[in-house]
Swiss-Prot record:
InterPro entries: Ribosomal_uL4 (IPR002136), Ribosomal_uL4-like (IPR013005), Ribosomal_uL4_dom_sf (IPR023574). This is Large ribosomal subunit protein uL4. Part of the 50S ribosomal subunit. The lineage of its organism: Bacteria, Pseudomonadati, Pseudomonadota, Gammaproteobacteria, Enterobacterales. It comes from the Bacteria.
């Protein structure tokens, strides 16, 4: 199959298995959930009554005070006491093998092509690391919410995009399923397309 280059009067021949396969929604969902779960820190921690700092002495005698009986200031029902079912640091990551991950990326790329959300260009760059230059270039292309993928990371382009809220710049090795579906449009250079094809082959 062929992808039309927007900035040149030509087309790029690409593999149909990468850019023309059926959309596997269940697979994409599983991989996206696993990717997001893997990004969680999982470092939250709370203290049980055994771990809270404080005396182990009984606050007051059992009977005769008129107050409710109490055995510890570290009780979970006391203010500043321990937590009954305290959270523990945990690993939230889910296992996804390479075949599934690559299959999900191919499904997403193919769906982007079908929805006309993938724009392929010969090259994409700015003359200087200026946000204004990139903003004008995107405006001329009628792009606002966009992921730009280049063969090699262009430092000028990367620096120019840092202050644009709905614009992200990655090299071909830095793509992931979440970023591909998070933006309205994806701009890829011809070099990036070839690299992605090789990665997913």
């Amino acid at each position: 199959m062929e992808l039309v280059l927007k900035d040149a009067q030509s087309a790029l021949t690409v593999s149909e298995t990468t850019f023309g396969r059926d959309f596997n929604e269940a697979l994409v969902h599983q991989v996206v959930v696993a990717y997001a779960a893997g990004a969680r820190q999982g470092t939250r921690a709370q203290k049980t009554r055994a771990e809270v700092t404080g005396s182990g002495k009984k606050p007051w005698r059992q009977k005769g005070t008129g107050r409710a009986r109490s055995g510890s200031i570290k009780s979970p029902i006391w203010r500043s006491g321990g937590v009954t079912f305290a959270a523990r640091p945990q690993d939230h990551s889910q296992k996804v093998n390479k075949k599934m991950y690559r299959g999900a990326l191919k499904s997403i790329l193919s769906e982007l092509v079908r929805q006309d959300r993938l724009i392929v260009v010969e090259k994409f760059s700015v003359e200087a690391p200026k946000t204004k230059l990139l903003a004008q270039k995107l405006k001329d292309m009628a792009l606002e919410d966009v992921l730009i993928i280049t063969g090699e990371l262009d430092e000028n382009l990367f620096l120019a995009a840092r202050n644009l809220q709905k614009v992200d710049v990655r090299d071909a090795t830095g793509i992931d399923p979440v970023s591909l579906i998070a933006f309205d449009k994806v701009v890829m250079t011809a070099d990036a397309v070839k690299q992605v094809e090789e990665m997913l082959a």
